[in-house]
Regions:
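Glycine-centered tight turns/hairpins at beta-strand boundaries that repeat
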Residues: 4-19, 30, 54-70, 80, ...
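Repeated scaffold domains used in trafficking and secretory/extracellular systems
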Residues: 46-50, 96-100, 146-147
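Conserved small/polar residues in nucleotide/adenosyl-binding loops
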Residues: 148-156
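A short beta-strand motif characteristic of beta-propeller blades
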Residues: 37-41, 87-91, 137-141
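A detector of repeated loop/turn-to-beta-strand junctions in beta-rich toroidal repeat architectures
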Residues: 21-24, 36, 70-74, 86, ...
Length: 158
């Protein structure tokens, strides 16, 4: 599941249960308690997408699609303050899932994950400029391949 937030909303996108993937996007209002509300849908069902965002935009990238077992290369975005379906942002260089995302207010990093060959892990880091749609670009590589990573970021650093 991809997660991202603004100061007022927390958003979760995608996910799975043992039989299916989901493309649903839900949100909560940070200042109150209660159940999540439907925000919209991703462009495709996906398990294990990477999430990142800034105060304005949320990004859900990559993932894995059941039942055809395909990794996804697409990057989707939403405007956090509104509701509605995601739109296409661009593509990653490699189809991957279960990587991590991190962001500053301007740049997002899409980090590592699992690639299509069974059991292969990916050590590449790609970046996007959150305000501008387009394909991810090479940022660098991790020293080691990682899978099922986690993410964190603040106002200054991813």
């Amino acid at each position: 599941m991809a997660g991202f937030a603004s100061r007022t909303r927390g958003v979760a996108a995608g996910g799975f249960d043992p039989t299916a993937n989901y493309k649903r996007i839900d949100f909560v209002t940070m200042s109150s308690t209660g159940d999540a509300t439907n925000f919209g849908s991703l462009t495709s069902n996906r398990e294990g997408p990477m999430g990142l965002g800034n105060e304005t935009r949320g990004i859900a990238a990559a993932g894995w699609s059941r039942p055809n077992s395909n990794n996804i290369q697409a990057i989707d975005f939403v405007t956090i303050a509104s509701t509605g379906d995601s739109q296409n942002f661009g593509d990653l260089a490699q189809r991957t899932n279960y990587g991590a995302g991190a962001a500053s207010p301007t740049r997002g990093l899409l980090i590592a994950g699992n690639i299509p060959a069974p059991g292969d892990m990916y050590n590449r880091i790609e970046f996007i400029t959150i305000a501008s749609q387009g394909d991810a670009q090479e940022f660098g590589e991790l020293k080691h391949c990682l899978l099922y990573t986690s993410d964190a970021a603040d106002e200054e650093r991813g």
